[in-house]
UniProtKB/Swiss-Prot annotation:
Signal peptide: none
Region described as Disordered: 341-452, 489-796, 1024-1069, 1161-1187
Coiled-coil intervals, chain numbering: 847-874
Record field: catalytic activity: S-ubiquitinyl-[E2 ubiquitin-conjugating enzyme]-L-cysteine + [acceptor protein]-L-lysine = [E2 ubiquitin-conjugating enzyme]-L-cysteine + N(6)-ubiquitinyl-[acceptor protein]-L-lysine
Catalytic machinery residues: 1540 (glycyl thioester intermediate)
This protein's name: E3 ubiquitin-protein ligase HECW2
Comp. bias regions, Low complexity: 400-410, 744-776
Compositionally biased tracts (Basic residues): 1031-1040
Enzyme class label: transferase
GO cellular component: cytoplasm; mitotic spindle
Length: 1572
């Protein structure tokens, strides 16, 4: 009875239009407060605020006019000025003036990641269902996305529609109302299943359905007693693809009523707090009944959102059976009385939001009637939702009626009387009627709800049972937004013969064009042909994935994924049964084949699971997009087909769609994958009625030239939307695809500089149907009962899901494109990313290993990415996982520049590029003596100084040799290099000179089978000492160029060719070389430049210096800033050339105060050692870190740790105990670390224990913990971070992180992890950009930092800084950015639109532009991270470091120097350096590639990073402890490690082969701790 009483109260509440609705758990107030406040109340003011007259302190939303006539030329402009906190998920909605429910918006726009607290947008209002009266009053409301709080409302705006004839609408509505108002029908829903529901951070949801009957939207439809019937399904545990087996739910309703279905998560865990709303549908009953004459059918709808800020993904499928209709004259009121209280009380057997129901309850799904649960929802707008922007909406009614088939009558049909009798009998007690027995055995009682009984507890847990009410409340007015409805998708069993008609019949009837968002939403449904589904699904999915827990068997998942994936404009993978060329679109136009329910859905492979993994949660885009994605293609409504070709599609199972064309191209090729949803919306709006083209295009086959579609496996396999949009002429389609192809080609060409592994180069011909893996993965992982924290911080995945279609990726892999347009690959099983395309699927047993282990053992090269970890000594022939995958990337990259490349095998391409980079021109350009030689050639020097393009090219090549591939045929570069050629010498071996038909000489390199106009007889050797520019080579941190110092090495797949790799130093003995540290030389340069008369000295050899003000400023900058300044300017060609003139003076110069310092011991002239450091304590591996800070840094670091100890940081006596499950690493770390107070984090000792492992934490487990956490937490997979623009191993905060659930807490957690690692002296295997470290230190960024975020933008501003812009650039202090889906102008300073940029104020302009660009979209996230960091560490202590130093403290280095390693290794148990086993050991280590060496290091020490000082300073459990190899064990045993003591126990193996095999096995396969 308690339940019924509560239901009654809620029933009453939802009919009160003045009720205040809770929009999200975060906004929960006490229940009492909820019953008092009107939603449209203006901002409440504090009683103490006496300034009630002025509005300066209040948020405002205003319009440019308050009378608007539809069709007028003048735009309606909405202005906002929000004083409170704003968020990327904020939205503005258009409402009827009397509307109080936030969910009943007629149109809405989301803000997106850019934008500020003030701004304006143009709002287009178009005639539609909501404006069918001569005059109607509306208003706009601004809502905060996270809390749902109303920020501001506009005054009343009157919209006039001169085209409407008075009374026509009213008469029509009234007539129809009278006609049907007395006709009650009974219908049953069965075979319900959902696909691709949104996942939480750590858990799969435990979904259940809430279904109810509500009156239609029009005011002429009365509210009757039967309204409020409610059903709740059983709870399906731990799945994103629930199937309610054999459960039936019957209702009776008027034809004018609507059926509302809401999916919620019965979330009973304590943390983290999440939203339980998973999606909703609002479907007119008439639409369902219209299927009766068509035959058996499966309906599929994309789930919609309640509010624009909701993140929803997936779709719902079910069958409808009309069981009876009541006498036409039966009065609904009379029926209501028969139902009596029953209609108010919910089905007792169904889960209740507030009560735990005993598992034994039988849900009489079929029989009982109950009020609809509150939440169900207003949002589900009926078809006619009004959208102001122009997007194509198709009337589902038409579509469904034509395309769907009704199911044959069921064996048991209940008459209305039976139904009512059953209700009467079961009413309060238990819903089990006869039909109950039909209930699926699959839903076991234990899966039933176990909701907390106390509503206050719910509020505390932020699990708002009212949230549901609210949704429901949204008022039975259901905005008819298509988004919500999602088009209806029919799975027809019938043959495809009549499909064509479906499309033709779809009409754009009364669905007005909706806002771009909506359109994106809608656009998403494509059906796939049943024919290809089975093949694709089978081939791509792992064999027989286990059904999800709670589901009896394979879900009938439409293979629509395939089709929908295309949504985005990708071509459909249709394989016409007729055998017609797939390249041509079906004659029928865009008609899509309905996937046959039995064939495609019940394949057994459970594509749905697959998709669920992919889970397209649109969330990633701004809401509008999210809507689109929410209706994953499954909805076949044209709407979706239409514009939305957007990412909504991305949710597709790419596996199915192996041939998809490129999604990207469908969307704007130039748009970054992570664009705000508005962008996408815009795309949708752009082609309101072009759904056809999208579909048609889908059918066409991807041609080699076109960019393959990046298909995102959306979690929902798109249900095959039966209807397809009308298809434009094939000619038009042809043009579209030609245009796309050319755009893609252009894009590929533009990216010709070698791309990172996955970039546009791939576009050339590969369409990876990646999500197939996802499917497989899901099947596997879900089968185990617990889905690994797949999307810990859950981000709207569609945002980034773009897949190139090539051959299908292995199961559970997906290709995405980042915000810089680069392709990377996502492993959904291990939650990792990599730049290399995965090859063969992993062995089955690998999938059963824990995520963190796999993460270390599989292709995840995130931070140990090729560029960071590969040493120059690494043999090219190594093609293991690390660069085996890279081969393809290389191939793709090369294809951008070499069109012929695609005919070469990968290995050929790779070796050719390698040979090219070892060619004489490259060796000459990167030679340390290059500038010296340049000075000796006056004509070449003159050309170099006068040609800025040439200087730029040479600088780029010296920074990253892979750029040579791009510039090698440049006329200026060729002519320049040929000036140095010695034509008297013979050609190098393997070279030949020939002449073309014009008599021009060219050279053939038979080694690489290439030709060039560059004469290879270049001066590669110099008699001058090699120390000329040692500093330049060492300024670059080989391990983790924190800010991408190596320039764009990210654009190529092979190891970077650093400016001066260690191999270029032909030292007499390795130990000597090891002493050569750049520190001394850099210090010498600074000291030399700090001489009082330095400018006079410099002018003696460089007279032009007096006129070169830029160079003088750089010298002065170094004099002021010291070595940090020198580091920053280390790649400046002019400065380097100037310093090269004074090489001897610099080397011989010793400051007076340093004469006695051991660091300045002179080395013999001619020795490659420029300045050996004789202090043994400071020996360090060559170029391990930026030299400039060596001695200073050591002093700072010692002092820093001393102060930490003095202040009691990490000293105890308490312990910070972390008990971690390896397969729930982030979840456990987040919950435990965020549960400690600031004081505990600072004071207590850290003690980490891995569950099920006996090891004691004498630092080994703690080190591995930080290693593993850093690899997961800072992984772009979760959407919090993204790879920087310059490389593929440093990361930065992603603007799209704003769409990750609970993202502020995640960034705070990230900051705490950084702080804990710092005070406990552990290293993180994570490398960030320089601006990130500056943000941690709260240091302002400058122009040089911008290069790490946007290289081209940096170059533009740099050019502007270096050149006179007088009368050249017409700029003002403004910048354009996208807000609420529109490009708006933002002022960089007050009145900036009227302030021109001049030579005088350009410095300020550059500073403001840099600040805007660096902070864009990440200000709040950065603040949260910094806050978490300083909750652990005192800001004053950390402030002693600069950005580069802080990076060294946090991340150490990872470029392994074997000589340093060997020289700092100890031996025990009879081993010594010359022992045969030890020699074999080091030979094996040398044979390892750098990644394997790092694994060995991680195996023995617990981390792949090493301290900045090198191996001499490795730490153990009680201080520094060197790497040690001890003779131990039988030769049959594997080596074992003691991570707390950095010791490797190595048995005395009898042969090198055995040692190598055993060592490799131990390193690659071992990952747990044991206790001796």
């Amino acid at each position: 009875m308690a339940s019924s009483a509560r239901e009654h109260l809620l029933f009453v509440r939802r009919r009160n239009p003045q009720m205040r609705y809770t929009l999200s758990p975060e906004n929960l107030q006490s229940l009492a407060a909820q019953s008092s406040m009107p939603e449209n109340m203006t901002l409440q003011r504090a009683n103490s605020d006496t300034d009630l007259v002025t509005s300066e302190s209040r948020s405002s939303l205003t319009a440019s006019m308050y009378e608007y006539t539809l069709g007028q030329a003048q735009n309606l402009i909405i202005f906002w000025d929000i004083k409170e906190e704003v968020d990327p998920s904020d939205w503005i909605g258009l409402y009827h003036i009397d509307e109080n429910s936030p969910a009943n918006f007629w149109d809405s726009k989301n803000r997106g990641v850019t934008g500020t607290q003030k701004g304006q947008i143009v709002w287009r209002i178009e005639p539609g269902p909501y404006f069918m009266e001569p005059e109607i009053k509306i208003c706009f409301k601004y809502y905060h996305g996270i809390s749902g709080a109303l920020r501001a409302t506009t005054p009343c705006i009157t919209v006039k529609n001169p085209a409407v004839m008075m009374g026509a609408e009213g008469m029509e509505g009234g007539a129809s109302g009278n006609l049907h108002s007395r006709k009650l029908v009974s219908f049953t829903l069965s075979d319900l299943r959902a696909v691709g529901l949104k996942k939480g951070m750590f858990f799969n949801p435990d979904p259940y359905l809430k279904m109810s009957i509500q009156p239609g939207k029009k005011s002429s439809f009365p509210t009757c007693a039967h309204h409020g019937q409610e059903r709740r399904s059983t709870i399906i545990s731990n799945t994103t693809n629930p199937i309610w087996h054999r459960e039936k739910y019957s209702f009776f309703a008027l034809l004018t009523d609507v059926l509302e279905i809401e999916i919620k998560d019965k979330f009973a865990k304590s943390r983290p707090i999440i939203k339980r709303f998973l999606g909703k549908l609002t479907i007119p009953v008439q639409r369902l009944l219209e299927r009766q004459a068509i035959g058996d059918q499966m309906l599929s709808y994309n789930l919609g959102r309640r509010l624009p800020a909701d993140h929803v993904s997936g779709y719902l499928q079910f069958k409808v059976e009309v069981t009876s209709s009541v006498h036409e004259d039966a009065s609904p009121e009379a029926v209501g009385t028969i139902l009596g209280v029953n209609s108010v009380n919910g089905d007792l057997g169904s889960p209740s939001d507030d009560e735990d129901m005993p598992g034994s309850h039988h849900d009489s799904q079929v029989c009982s009637n109950g009020p609809v649960s509150e939440d169900s929802a207003a949002d589900g707008t009926p078809k006619h939702s009004f959208r102001t922007s122009s997007t194509l909406e198709i009337d589902t009614e038409e579509l469904t009626s034509t395309s769907s088939r009704t199911s044959p009558p069921r064996g048991r049909q209940d008459s209305l009387n039976d139904y009512l009798d059953a209700i009467e009998h079961n009413g309060h007690s238990r819903p089990g009627t006869a039909t109950c027995s039909e209930r699926s055995m699959g839903a076991s009682p234990k899966l039933r709800s176990s909701f907390p009984t106390d509503t206050r507890l719910n509020a505390m847990l932020h699990i708002d049972s009212d949230e549901e009410d609210h949704e429901f409340q949204q008022d039975l007015g259901y905005p008819s937004s298509l988004e919500e409805e999602g088009g209806l998708i029919m799975f027809s069993r019938a043959s495809r013969a009549d499909d064509g008609s479906l499309t033709s019949q779809t009409k754009l009837e009364d669905n007005p064009v909706e806002n771009e968002e909506a359109s994106t939403h809608e656009a998403a449904s494509f059906e796939d042909k049943p024919e290809n589904l089975p093949e694709l699904a089978e081939s791509s999915l792992p064999a027989g994935p286990a059904p999800e827990e709670g589901e009896g068997g394979p879900e009938p998942q439409p293979s629509a994924d395939q089709g929908s994936a295309e949504l985005c404009g990708s071509q459909e993978v249709d394989q016409p049964t007729s055998g017609a060329d797939t390249g041509t679109s079906d004659a029928s136009g865009g008609s899509r084949r309905a996937v046959s329910e039995t064939e495609s859905l019940d394949q057994g492979s459970e594509p749905s699971q697959v998709s669920s993994e992919t889970e397209p949660s649109d969330p990633a885009r701004t809401e509008s997009v999210s809507e689109a994605s929410t209706r994953p293609e499954g909805e076949s409504d044209l709407e979706c087909a239409d514009s939305s070709c957007n990412e909504s599609v991305t949710t597709q199972l790419s596996s199915v769609d192996t041939r998809c064309s490129s999604l990207e191209s469908a969307r704007f090729p130039e748009t970054p994958a992570f664009s705000s949803q508005e962008e996408e919306d815009g795309a949708c709006a752009a082609e309101p009625t072009s759904s056809g083209p999208a579909e048609g295009s889908q059918e066409s086959v991807c041609t080699a030239g076109s960019l393959p579609v990046v298909q995102v496996p959306s979690g929902e396999d798109e249900g095959p939307g039966a209807e397809s949009a009308t298809v434009p002429d094939q000619e038009e389609l042809g043009e579209v695809w030609q245009r796309r192809g050319s755009l893609e080609g252009a894009a590929a060409a533009a990216e010709s500089p070698p791309q990172e592994e996955g970039s546009a180069g791939e576009a050339q011909g590969t369409c990876e149907g990646a999500t197939a893996q996802e499917e497989g993965a899901t099947g596997g992982s879900q089968a185990n009962g617990h889905q690994p924290l797949r999307s810990l911080p859950s981000v709207r995945q569609d945002v980034s899901r773009y897949q190139r279609v090539d051959e299908a990726l292995p199961p559970n892999w997906e290709a995405r494109i980042d915000s810089h347009g680069r392709i990377f690959y996502v492993d959904h099983v291990n939650r990792t990313t990599t730049w290399q395309r995965p090859t063969a699927p992993p062995a089955p047993q690998v999938l059963q290993r824990s995520n963190s282990i796999q993460q270390m053992e599989q292709l995840n090269r995130r931070y140990q990415s090729i560029r960071r970890t590969m040493t120059n000594e690494r043999p090219e022939e190594n093609t293991n996982a690390i660069d085996g995958a890279g081969e393809e990337a290389d191939f793709h990259q090369a294809s951008a520049d070499f069109r012929r490349e695609n005919i070469l095998p990968h290995s050929t391409s790779r070796s050719r590029i390698t040979l090219l980079l070892q060619s004489p021109p490259v060796k000459f350009l990167i030679s340390p003596e290059f500038f010296t030689v340049l000075h000796s050639n006056p004509s070449a020097y003159r050309m170099f100084t006068n040609n800025t393009c040439l200087k730029h090219m040479i600088t780029k090549v010296r920074r990253d040799t892979h750029h040579f591939e791009r510039y090698q045929h440049n006329r200026d570069l060729v002519g320049f290099l040929n000036m140095f050629a010695n034509k008297q010498l013979e050609l190098p071996r393997g070279w030949e000179m020939k002449h073309d038909h014009q008599g021009k000489a060219f050279f053939v390199d038979h080694n690489s089978r290439t030709t060039t106009f560059i004469d290879p007889r270049l001066p590669l050797q110099s008699s001058r000492p090699t120390s000329a520019l040692v500093h330049r080579q060492h300024l670059t941190r080989q391990r983790s160029h924190s800010a991408g110092e190596v320039g764009e090495d990210s654009r190529h797949a092979g190891p970077p060719v650093l400016p001066r790799p260690s191999s270029t130093f032909n030292t007499v003995s390795r130990p000597q070389y090891q002493d050569m540290v750049p520190v001394a030389y850099n210090d010498k340069i600074v000291a030399f430049l700090r001489q009082p008369n330095i400018f006079e000295i410099l002018q003696e050899r460089q007279p032009d210096l007096t006129r070169n003000h830029s160079l003088r400023e750089k010298i002065q900058f170094i004099r002021t800033e010291g070595t940090p300044g020198l580091v920053r300017l280390s790649s400046d060609a002019d400065l380097v050339m100037l310093l090269s003139l004074f090489e001897e003076e610099i080397m011989s110069y010793v400051p007076p105060h340093a004469l006695l310092h051991p660091s300045y011991c002179q080395s013999p002239r001619g020795s490659p050692v420029s300045s050996p450091q004789n202090s043994p304590g400071t020996q360090r591996a060559n170029a391990r870190a930026p030299a400039p800070y060596k001695r200073d840094f050591e002093a700072k670091l010692r002092n820093f740790y001393r102060k930490l100890e003095t202040k009691g940081y990490g000293q105890g006596p308490g312990k910070l105990k972390l008990i971690i499950r390896r397969d729930h690493l982030l979840e456990d770390a987040f919950n435990q670390i965020m549960g400690y107070s600031r004081k505990d984090l600072q004071r207590n000792k850290l003690y980490v224990t891995f569950v099920g492992e006996e090891g004691l934490d004498y630092s080994g487990p703690s080190r591995e913990f930080f290693f593993l956490v850093s690899r997961e937490l800072f992984n772009p997979y979760y959407g919090l971070f993204e790879y920087s623009a310059n490389d593929t191993y440093t990361v930065q905060i992603s603007p799209m992180s704003a769409f990750v659930d609970n993202h502020h807490e995640w960034f705070r957690f990230s900051g705490r992890i950084l702080g804990l690692a710092l005070i406990h002296q552990y290293l993180l295997d994570a490398f960030f950009t320089r601006p990130f470290y500056k943000a941690l230190l709260r240091i302002l960024c400058d122009l040089s930092d911008l290069e790490y975020l946007d290289e081209e933008f940096h170059q533009s501003l740099q050019w502007m800084k270096d050149n006179d812009i007088h009368d050249i650039l017409d700029l003002t202090f403004t910048v354009n950015e996208e807000v609420f889906g529109q490009i708006t102008e933002r002022e960089l300073k007050p009145g900036g639109a009227n302030i021109p940029v001049t030579e005088k104020n350009k410095k300020e302009y550059i500073e403001r532009m840099v600040k805007w660009r660096i902070e864009r979209g990440v200000v709040q996230q950065t603040e949260s991270l910094v806050r978490g960091f300083y909750e652990v560490v005192d800001a004053r202590l950390v402030s002693v470091f600069d950005a580069r130093e802080l990076e060294l403290v946090i991340a150490g280095t990872a470029e392994i120097d074997l000589s340093d390693w060997r020289n700092n290794t100890e031996y025990r148990g009879g081993y010594h350096d010359n022992h045969i086993v030890i020699r074999w050991f080091w030979a094996a280590v040398e044979r390892f590639n750098n990644e394997q060496r790092l694994r060995l290091l991680q195996f023995v020490t617990g981390t792949s990073s090493i301290p900045y000082e090198g191996f001499a300073s490795l730490r153990g459990s009680n201080g520094p402890r060197r790497f040690c190899v001890e003779k131990w064990g039988k030769i049959t045993a594997l080596p074992r490690a003691h991570t707390c003591f950095n010791r490797l126990d190595l048995p005395p193996y009898p042969s090198f082969s055995m040692l190598y095999e055993k060592l490799l096995t131990a390193v690659e396969e071992t990952s747990t701790f044991g206790l001796e």
